[in-house]
Amino acid sequence: MLAPHISVVNLGCRVNRVESDRITADLMRLGFAIVEPQDADLIVINTCAVTGEAEAKTRKAVRHALAYPGEPYVVVTGCVVNLHPEELLELSDRVIAEPSKIDVAERVCEVLGVESDSVPACSDGEVVDALGRSRLGVKIQDGCNHRCTYCIVWKARGPERSVPVESVLEQVREAQEAGVPEVVLTGVNLGAYDGKSATDEHVEIDELLEAIMERTSIPHVRISSVEPMDISERLLKVMARYPQRIAPFLHLPVQSGCTATLHRMGRPYSAEAFEDTVRMIRAILPQASLSCDVIVGFPGETDEEFEESLALCRRVGFSRMHVFRYSKRPGTLAADMPDQVPPEVMAERSRRMRAAAQELAIADARRRVGMVERAVLEYGDNLTLGSFHHARLDDTCGLTAPCLLDVAIIGVDDSGLVHARREVHGSLED
């Protein structure tokens, strides 16, 4: 009998991506064949609810899956399932909800009638073998204790909790042994990491990063999103001590560059405090690139407040910006705030912010010409630099992707694409 065919569809954030990869590897370990959705007997959809648009994409993905001629079952998991599963269950009796992502593989067995007393957890090495990733996400934290007025994720993900230190180190070592050139530490609120050591001591994010440097040989580590108020001098100094092994990159979800807007959002810092944090980063990590999330059109955002936000982004000089139009989420405080911004105003502000983002990305890339950076060769001649810019390598002779190498940045084209050459013994190759 042929093994049932399964497809895993991921929607949403980097944390979801890491969780979907693990679900895929769990299913492969059980002998299921992973295929494209149109060929599947069962489709797993890891859902996202961060915005109204994300929820709409989830419903569309489920309807699309149900429409395939093979009439597959659809197992849904993730944030939408944790908030209001009935919206998906009412679409068909072929839709099955599984709130616990670690139990998805077992639920798949149940739906398809495959005997399994329990589903063993897979290792990160098996994830790499199954998915062929050039970098591996290591989830070290989940949940959020903040209550930002626009956000519904804390309801979907629950309170903050952290993976124990020894478990994180084991995952990193497995990735290293599998030949992964870079791991990315991920979490819903990464800077709130508060794991327990083997001796039951509390360990914060900077101490965890130091432990990874001292107790593993992983070639390269990247930190994903860290809230601005969680950026500490201690964390930055750890990053500065290991410039060859820690990517000089931080993603800071500033959300707005206007203090009045930040206050209505329930963000625990001012625009001035954010810029103080940026100055501290620049002082300790002068070559670091900074990316951000920014929301336009939050309730009550005036033209003047938007201009303040745009001006801050220009002053900081972000290398990458994720620009979101405010999305009204039922059950949040912001949904009932007065002075909701008209859609056409949001659209224009989004256009201007995205235009600025493109200009800033190119400017940051161009200031790096002549610098040497660590980079991951992903495939072909495609590189991801330590600064998280995408680049093309001029010569891949003798290289097998994925791999880590030093490159010299030699140019940037008008689209912002970086061009690089291999660095040998501290000088450009002739």
Regions found by a protein language model. Name each.
Residues 74-75, 83, 177-303:
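Conserved SAM/AdoMet-binding glycine-rich loop
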Residues 10, 187, 225, 254-256, ...:
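Active-site proximal loops enriched in glycine and acidic residues that flank catalytic Cys/His/Asp
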Residues 301, 317-318:
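Contiguous mid-protein beta-loop-alpha structural module that forms a pocket-lining wall or clamp
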Residues 131-134, 144-146, 256, 288, ...:
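Short flexible coil/turn linkers enriched for glycine and charged/polar residues
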Residues 336-430:
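Terminal RNA-binding accessory module
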Residues 67-69, 240-244, 317:
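Short, conserved loop/helix-junction motifs that constitute active-site signature segments
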Residues 1-194, 201-204, 250, 272-283, ...:
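Proteins enriched for Cys/Gly/acidic motifs involved in redox and nucleic-acid/cofactor modification
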Residues 252, 293, 313, 321, ...:
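Hydrophobic, well-ordered secondary-structure elements that form the walls
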